Amino acid sequence: MNLAIVEAPADSTPPPADPLDHLADALFHEMGSPGVYGRTALYEDVVERIAAVISRNREPNTEVMRFPPVMNRAQLERSGYLKSFPNLLGCVCGLHGIESEIDAAISRFDAGGDWTESLSPADLVLSPAACYPLYPIAASRGPVPAAGWSFDVAADCFRREPSRHLDRLQSFRMREFVCIGSADHVSAFRERWIIRAQKIARDLGLTFRIDHANDPFFGRVGQMMAVSQKQLSLKFELLVPLRSEERPTACMSFNYHRDHFGTTWGIVDAAGEPAHTACVAFGMDRLAVAMFHTHGKDVALWPIAVRDLLGLAQTDRGAPSAFEEYRCAKEAGS
């Protein structure tokens, strides 16, 4: 779920207005770091309603898991993320040591120094994707049955990609459906979801296209991995033209990992071979931004079919809409 966006040089004139900037005040609260925002009630309500639509499309016999925003560092290292995307990883650090050592760090801060020199890494990292904590859990259950396993997972995720663009957050929500089983089983799962996800996007009133894609692997070796990923059709994305047709935003992705996680974690299928895995990922914040950019900030004016799908009751004539309530509150606070 990544899209390269060119940033203006640091010494350039202020960048021109981005096509999504008009949404910022209605949807987000600045928190002092690019891509990290507080979220308004108007925005969160739509995120939750999109999540409900996705849940209604969940396949039978799918196990639901919800993960915290952090995961075990050793598990992420074993999964291979550090080798593929080291530049995107966020590691949890803390002030460890005896009282005098911690006091020294505080004293350094009081004196105007850099207290972070005393930080050392914990055994946790910020989760870069919702599915990574799943694989060691699945591995602990023994062989995968012939019918395979299907999971619905979600997490608050983090990738160190500071950006002023509202469709590239550092802290974001990801929802995934993950399939573990034989190569044929997980390939069929991905094909079903490519079709199903397009219907969801159409029902949401979004303009989109499906295209081959690759992850932003790090370094020169990563460039070769990206070419291979594309050539083997291991990744597709559902792209929404929020800025233009030439610079679309990936709001969903459809990924086939082959036996990478099966081999890494010792997950075997019913035949005793390394299990294959696939996932469909929904960028919940990108989908919500796409909805507001497509249909406007006042949900009362969204197409009736979209409102019905999301369960938005028709606004009574004369009653203020959620956006009008937000606008009044904004004006009262200014």
Curated annotation (Swiss-Prot):
<feature type="binding site">
    <location>
        <position position="161"/>
    </location>
    <ligand>
        <name>ATP</name>
    </ligand>
</feature>
<feature type="binding site">
    <location>
        <position position="286"/>
    </location>
    <ligand>
        <name>ATP</name>
    </ligand>
</feature>
<keyword id="KW-0479">Metal-binding</keyword>
<comment type="subunit">
    <text>Homodimer.</text>
</comment>
<keyword id="KW-0067">ATP-binding</keyword>
<dbReference type="GO" id="GO:0005524">
    <property type="term" value="F:ATP binding"/>
</dbReference>
<dbReference type="InterPro" id="IPR045864">
    <property type="entry name" value="aa-tRNA-synth_II/BPL/LPL"/>
</dbReference>
<comment type="similarity">
    <text>Belongs to the class-II aminoacyl-tRNA synthetase family. Amino acid--[acyl-carrier-protein] ligase subfamily.</text>
</comment>
<feature type="binding site">
    <location>
        <position position="235"/>
    </location>
    <ligand>
        <name>ATP</name>
    </ligand>
</feature>
<feature type="binding site">
    <location>
        <position position="176"/>
    </location>
    <ligand>
        <name>Zn(2+)</name>
    </ligand>
</feature>
<dbReference type="GO" id="GO:0016874">
    <property type="term" value="F:ligase activity"/>
</dbReference>
<dbReference type="GO" id="GO:0046872">
    <property type="term" value="F:metal ion binding"/>
</dbReference>
<feature type="binding site">
    <location>
        <position position="279"/>
    </location>
    <ligand>
        <name>Zn(2+)</name>
    </ligand>
</feature>
<feature type="binding site">
    <location>
        <position position="159"/>
    </location>
    <ligand>
        <name>ATP</name>
    </ligand>
</feature>
<comment type="function">
    <text>Catalyzes the ATP-dependent activation of L-glycine and its transfer to the phosphopantetheine prosthetic group covalently attached to the vicinal carrier protein blr6284 of yet unknown function. May participate in nonribosomal peptide synthesis or related processes. L-alanine is a poor substrate whereas L-serine or D-amino acids are not substrates for ATP-dependent activation. Does not display tRNA aminoacylation activity.</text>
</comment>
<keyword id="KW-0436">Ligase</keyword>
<protein>
    <recommendedName>
        <fullName>Amino acid--[acyl-carrier-protein] ligase 2</fullName>
        <ecNumber>6.2.1.n2</ecNumber>
    </recommendedName>
</protein>
<feature type="binding site">
    <location>
        <position position="131"/>
    </location>
    <ligand>
        <name>Zn(2+)</name>
    </ligand>
</feature>
<feature type="binding site">
    <location>
        <position position="176"/>
    </location>
    <ligand>
        <name>an L-alpha-amino acid</name>
    </ligand>
</feature>
<keyword id="KW-0862">Zinc</keyword>
<feature type="binding site">
    <location>
        <begin position="168"/>
        <end position="169"/>
    </location>
    <ligand>
        <name>ATP</name>
    </ligand>
</feature>
<feature type="binding site">
    <location>
        <begin position="250"/>
        <end position="253"/>
    </location>
    <ligand>
        <name>ATP</name>
    </ligand>
</feature>
<keyword id="KW-0547">Nucleotide-binding</keyword>
